[in-house]
Design a protein with these regions (language model features):
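Surface-exposed molecular-recognition determinants
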Residues: 1-180
Length: 180
């Protein structure tokens, strides 16, 4: 498996970060690597949504997602746990899919991880995805967050957008790779 770098975007008080080109039939698998996504607002979820080929340039608000989320966490005060995160699941919803819990905006808090999107150019199958993130929570905990699901769309998916559910992305970089 080799990663071929396609594009990068860097936040600077950005409302969203999007890739509107580069996702096509060249690769069957695309990875998005997130480095220190730091929110301007405290206690916010980092999330994504896609545009199908019939809505390119649209509002990233029509593709239906179904997903499941699990997390492990550890507070600085020494409490820890493992849980299913039902509030982050989507069930045939056009909402943005959460990739993290509530990220803090202290100077040392951020979220980093990888989202993998499978066969986005397929016009036969729905689009599966997996994500794994580590984030620094607003109340001084670290979290290992796993999300998996599918985009219930048989049209190609050429665009993807990322944002925090409230406020701007203060800083951070997203790199898009094709997987060979």
């Amino acid at each position: 498996m080799a990663l071929i770098h396609i594009a990068s975007v860097t936040a600077s008080s950005s409302a969203t970060l999007s890739f509107t080109s580069g996702i096509d039939s060249t690769y069957n698998e695309y990875q998005f690597h997130f480095e220190n996504m730091h929110p301007a607002t405290d206690q916010v979820f980092f999330q994504f949504q896609v545009n199908a080929s019939d809505d390119t340039g649209g509002g990233f608000d029509t593709s239906v997602i179904t997903s499941s989320a699990f997390l492990a966490y550890h507070f600085e005060g020494d409490a820890s746990g493992l849980s299913y995160s039902g509030t982050q699941d989507l069930a045939q919803s056009a909402s943005h899919q959460r990739l993290t819990q509530e990220v803090g905006n202290n100077a040392d808090q951020s979220a980093s991880g990888i989202l993998t999107l499978y066969t986005p150019a397929s016009t036969t199958y729905t689009k599966n995805f997996t994500a794994r993130f580590a984030d620094s929570g607003y109340n001084d905990y670290v979290e290992d967050h796993h999300v998996a699901g599918y985009i219930n769309q048989t049209l190609a998916i050429p665009e993807i957008s990322f944002k925090f559910h409230s406020g701007n992305i203060d800083a951070g970089t997203i790199k898009m790779f094709g997987v060979t």
